[in-house]
């Protein structure tokens, strides 16, 4: 997926990281899994949102890429 295919908030954050306004995290996969875990564990969110986050996290964990 390319940044231009993402929502406005992601594109804005991407630009802020690229411009030095926000910090770059070299362990991006770890950061993503932690974020998906936070979303999946939040019982206040709709079940379908939590399941999508869990699916994304599980796929990242099963991938052969390591941070």
Swiss-Prot record:
It comes from the Bacteria. This is UPF0253 protein PBPRA2947. Coiled coil: none annotated. NCBIfam families: PRK04964.1. Belongs to the UPF0253 family.
């Amino acid at each position: 997926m390319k940044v231009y295919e993402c929502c406005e908030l992601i594109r804005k954050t991407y630009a802020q990281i690229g411009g030095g306004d926000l910090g770059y995290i070299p362990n991006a996969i770890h950061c993503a899994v932690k974020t998906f875990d936070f979303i999946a564990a939040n019982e206040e969110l709709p079940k379908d949102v939590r399941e999508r986050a869990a699916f994304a996290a599980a796929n990242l964990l099963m991938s052969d890429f390591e941070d």
